[in-house]
Regions:
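N-terminal glycine-rich FAD/FM-binding segment characteristic of electron-transfer flavoproteins
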Residues: 1-262
């Protein structure tokens, strides 16, 4: 039976996290001798992007009612088409809220923040982050039904081209739990979750007027900017840049901290 993977898109566009999740699913499928089926909701990007990383089949869910994200509604939609025993999700903010709801619907085990391909399939055992990223855990699950979320920038994006096929699935999922009053889309900035280099700063900068040097350094390095919790709390920087235990969990290859204690 195919290994299923949720290929998350943002406004129809696939991001690095989706390619990493497909790469991971391909590794799992390789251990099982199975194929990979990717699922996406209302994508506009070509399925060729997913074939490149190993998807043998792509199921595109089309549903006008799912234009606005709702974890519960998206979980219902994925549940309609995913009939495999192993499902892979990226560990993004949205996808990691869909995964537990889907696990509850299917009565599957859930293993989050996974770092590497399974150490074994029977039993299903993976290495995952624990204790706010300060340690690791080797967690087992029943391979007859398990969902994993793949920690970003951990497994990596690996090309493994497949001659894929595409299927369009038209659904009508009730999405009455969510009412969007407004939507603000940031533009022109790197996604902190996907950035390989991050420059972060704290109260040691003395004030928001001194942030120009941080932004200049980030621009020079091709990095994303981040900040500490106190800085976002007092309004020097937007809350979307807050990283750490109480903010966004990130995993860049290079992290530069300026004026941050601890």
């Amino acid at each position: 039976m195919a290994v299923f993977v949720y290929a998350e898109n943002i406004n129809g566009i696939y991001k690095k996290a989706a390619f990493e999740a497909v790469s991971y699913a391909k590794a799992v499928a390789g251990q099982l001798g199975e194929t990979v089926t990717a699922i996406s909701v209302n994508p506009t990007d070509s399925s060729d992007l997913l074939y490149k990383y190993g998807a043998d089949k792509v199921i595109n869910i089309k549903d006008e009612g799912l234009k606005n994200f709702s974890a519960k509604a998206y979980a219902k939609a994925v549940n309609e088409v995913a009939d495999g025993n192993i499902l892979v999700f990226p560990h993004t903010t949205d996808a990691s809220s869909v995964a537990p709801m889907l696990a509850s619907m299917k009565h599957y085990s859930l293993r989050t923040n996974v770092l590497e391909a399974p150490e074994s399939i029977t039993p299903f055992q993976v290495k995952r982050r624990a204790f706010s990223g300060k340690g690791f855990m080797h967690a087992k699950a029943d391979a007859s039904g398990v969902i994993v979320t793949v920690s970003q920038n951990a497994f990596g994006v690996k090309e493994n081209p497949a001659s894929g096929t595409e299927e369009v699935k038209n659904l009508t999922i009730e999405n009455e739990d969510t009412k969007v009053l407004s939507h603000e889309q940031s533009s022109g900035k790197l996604d902190l979750k996907e950035a390989e280099v991050v420059v972060s700063a704290g109260r040691g900068m003395k004030g928001p007027e001194n942030w120009g040097m941080i932004e200049d350094l980030a621009a020079t390095l091709g990095a994303a900017t981040a900040c500490s919790k106190p800085v976002s709390d007092i309004g020097w920087r937007p809350h979307s840049e807050h990283v750490g235990q109480t903010g966004k969990a990130i995993a860049p290859n290079l992290y530069i901290a300026v004026g941050i204690s601890g």
